[in-house]
From Swiss-Prot:
Domain FHA-like: 38-87
EC number: 3.6.1.71, 3.6.1.72
Motif (Nuclear localization signal) on chain: 126-131
UniProt gene name: APTX
Protein name: Aprataxin
Chemical reaction(s) catalysed: a 5'-end adenosine-5'-diphospho-5'-2'-deoxyribonucleoside-DNA + H2O = a 5'-end 5'-phospho-2'-deoxyribonucleoside-DNA + AMP + 2 H(+); a 5'-end adenosine-5'-diphospho-5'-ribonucleoside-2'-deoxyribonucleotide-DNA + H2O = a 5'-end 5'-phospho-ribonucleoside-2'-deoxyribonucleotide-DNA + AMP + 2 H(+); a 3'-end 2'-deoxyribonucleotide-3'-diphospho-5'-guanosine-DNA + H2O = a 3'-end 2'-deoxyribonucleotide 3'-phosphate-DNA + GMP + 2 H(+)
GO molecular function, one term: single-strand break-containing DNA binding
UniProt note: domains: The histidine triad, also called HIT motif, forms part of the binding loop for the alpha-phosphate of purine mononucleotide.
Cited function: DNA-binding protein involved in single-strand DNA break repair, double-strand DNA break repair and base excision repair. Resolves abortive DNA ligation intermediates formed either at base excision sites, or when DNA ligases attempt to repair non-ligatable breaks induced by reactive oxygen species. Catalyzes the release of adenylate groups covalently linked to 5'-phosphate termini, resulting in the production of 5'-phosphate termini that can be efficiently rejoined.
The keyword Hydrolase is assigned to this record: yes
Lineage per the UniProt record: Eukaryota, Metazoa, Chordata, Craniata, Vertebrata
Alphabetized InterPro entries for the sequence: FHA_2 (IPR041388), FHA_APTX (IPR047289), Histidine_triad_CS (IPR019808), HIT-like (IPR011146), HIT-like_sf (IPR036265), SMAD_FHA_dom_sf (IPR008984), Znf-C2HE (IPR032566), Znf_C2H2_type (IPR013087)
Marked site: Interaction with DNA substrate: 188, 265, 276, 291
Length: 356
């Protein structure tokens, strides 16, 4: 058998980028979007959507594989949105990795993924998904949660929050784990370097982009996609997650006089249930905008105990309508309720409370 020697440039010439539309709750297989071909989807067997408010021809999608985005045109009458911003009938908007497309009425969330694939079937198929965990992509996310990764030790240089994860021998990532950054928790929770505590039910990791001096995530080993998937069967697990969160505060911030809150985002950006354990100083350069602030300081942040009581009484978690609108509220100090015009001014104001 003859040997074929390919240079790096030869390999890239043999590669082609492909685009996939992926349902975030994994209700159906991902849908391939061929380069520059108009694909119309909506209610039907392909999407498993039966909601009659969703047209059979709700959106037209056209992938610009070379440019790394998808043009989305709303065809149906009812609203299609990207990151909670309605597109509008017969209007066209770009959908980029890191953004969430809701098919209709803020329901049925989708993301796009790009992969590199070998053109020559004789070569071993090589796929490399376009990672969208950079800061720009995270800024676009509706909840603006950080992608957990290598994390920061309390007291370390918070400016690291703008530095991408290191690659190399020290940071192996399984091929099958690569994908949209919203799947990042599933990778991070398996990384011993990130774990600060674990037992048979849960693992605690440091948030890679902490929004305060102390910011951890408590995750169950059991795969639970979101709060909507929580049932009464998960009640003891939720209680255990809360107990572990309190334990981590004592173990790692016991000498601190900081106040903490434990809770969940109403609409999480990461596809695995996770409990935030966050100090209330919000002293972090990773806290960059209004959505970051409001995701922790409005009713968008669901208290852990309230979630437990909800499941105990109703057997499920109910998230009321209009949650994305809370992220647009004016900036208000969580300590004294004073309104502030900008994040820099809010941060300067918060310093006054640290000394009290």
């Amino acid at each position: 058998m003859s040997n074929v020697n390919l240079s790096v440039s030869d390999v890239w010439r043999l590669m082609m980028r492909v685009c996939w539309l992926v349902r975030q709750d994994s209700r159906h297989q991902r849908i391939r979007l061929p380069h520059l071909e108009a694909v119309v989807i909506g209610r039907g067997p392909e999407t498993k959507i039966t909601d009659k408010k969703c047209s059979r021809q709700q959106v037209q999608l056209k992938a610009e594989c070379n440019k790394g985005y998808v043009k989305v045109k709303q065809v149906g009458v009812n609203p299609t949105s990207i990151d909670s911003v309605v597109i509008g009938k017969d209007q066209e908007v770009k959908l980029q990795p890191g953004q969430v497309l809701h098919m209709v009425n803020e329901l049925y969330p989708y993301i796009v993924e790009f992969e590199e694939e070998a053109k020559n079937p004789g070569l071993e198929t090589h796929r490399k998904r376009k990672r969208s965990g950079d800061s720009d992509s995270i800024e676009r996310d509706a909840a603006h949660e950080a992608e957990p990764g290598t994390g920061l030790e309390p007291g370390s240089n918070h400016n690291q929050c703008s530095v991408p994860p290191k690659k190399g021998k020290d940071a192996p990532i399984k091929k099958e784990s690569l994908g949209h950054w919203s799947q990042g928790l599933k990778i991070s929770m398996q990384d011993p370097k990130m774990q600060v505590y674990k037992d048979e039910q849960v693992v605690v990791i440091k948030d890679k982009y902490p929004k305060a001096r102390y910011h951890w995530l408590v995750l169950p080993w059991t795969a639970i996609s979101s709060l909507k998937a929580v049932t009464r069967e998960h009640l003891e697990l939720l209680k255990h997650m809360h107990t572990v969160g309190e334990k981590v505060i004592v173990d790692f911030a016991g000498s601190s006089k900081l106040r903490f809150r434990l809770g969940y985002h109403a609409i999480p950006s990461m596809s695995h249930v996770h409990l935030h354990v966050i100090s209330q100083d919000f002293d972090s350069p990773c806290l960059k905008n209004k959505k970051h602030w409001n995701s922790f300081n409005t009713e968008y942040f669901l208290e852990s105990q309230a979630v437990i009581e909800m499941v105990q009484e109703a057997g499920r978690v109910t998230v009321r309508d209009g949650m994305p609108e809370l992220l647009k509220l004016p900036l208000r100090c969580h300590e004294c309720q004073q309104l502030l015009p900008s994040i820099p001014q809010l941060k300067e104001h918060l310093r006054k409370h640290w000394t009290q």
